[in-house]
Amino acid sequence: MKLEILEKINDSDYNEIVDDSKKSTFYTSYKFLEFIKENLKIKPSFIVSYEKSKINGVFPFFIKEGEYGKVINSLPFFGSYGGIISENSKIDKAIITEFNNYNKKNDVLSSVIIDNPFCKNEKIYSQFFNCTDIENRLIQSIILNSNSNEIWNNFEKRTRWSVRKSEKNNVEIIKFEHESEELENFYNLHLESMKKKNGRPKPKKLFSLLTKNFVNDRDYNIFIAKKDGRSISYILVFYYKNFSEYYLPAYDPNYLPLQSTSYLIWKSIQESIKRKIKFYNFGGTWKTQKELYLFKRGWNATDYNYKYFIFKNSELINSIGLEKILEKYQYFYISPIK
């Protein structure tokens, strides 16, 4: 077995192992890594394992250089997760050992592996990654293992009521094609929503990079709800293998009583069923987000637990202060907030 740390990898070589692996998700796809790269202006790095010149394992990660040292995430940027993609525990161990050595030899402030919730690989990281902290996380995902009627009947009554309210109020659902004004309105509604929640908005260039890096109606759809010709809510959904990723919603608060976001979700679930997708992934939910958790549970979403495995320089982080450090490493995870 041969191991290398690369700053560039051939996309066909990467796709060959990732597309065939049960451990890969949308977030570890080559297209999404390119999407992160252009959003963050940082190139990904890879630990690659070879057997007879053929790749049999890969570990993608991003390094943010800063005045306090390197911060490494596999993977950064709004709820992404990464980890090792291989089908052999010996390869996993070898890659983790190489990563441990990299962390030790370099000026690393924090190095984080965000485990894939769907492949249960956490024992490998628990045993072999030299972590100082482990943080528990949760995502919620609908398992699409039956027909549309059965899935509908498994939703809670309040969820079905929300969808029907939009239908009764003649809300129309369309798919985005190429209208730049729709992307502009989508972003403005997202920005307004994040300001009200005191949250961090996604960068505006995400939308131009979306149409550059992905193919509409193949890699993603933007579903748009309209009332009397006016666009009142949006959701962006990505598709990759067995996964639909509910990535970004936005809505006009003046039309909130129409429950159009629920109608959009249902239409996107129906689209996912047509595509024979297995998981409709709502993504992460914080422990403090009880209302959001109950909203997702109303769709009969299943809980999937996963972990952040963190190696960090605790002494340096404590002396500088985590809030001050976070300002310099935007879109990267560094340490639990205590």
PLM segments and residue spans:
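A conserved beta-strand-loop-helix scaffold within acyl/acetyltransferase catalytic domains
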Residues: 2-52, 58-69, 116-257
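Short, Lys/Arg-enriched, disordered terminal segments
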Residues: 1-7, 12, 90, 326-338
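Active-site/acyl-donor-binding loops of N-acyltransferases
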Residues: 46, 59, 63, 125-150, ...
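Active-site phosphate/ATP/adenylate-binding loop shared across adenylate-forming ligases
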Residues: 84
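Aromatic (often tryptophan-rich) hydrophobic motifs at membrane interfaces
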Residues: 48-55, 79, 87-102, 208-320
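Conserved acyl-donor/pantetheine-binding loop and adjacent beta-alpha core of acyl/acetyltransferases
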Residues: 65-81
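Non-catalytic accessory segments adjacent to catalytic cores
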Residues: 90-136
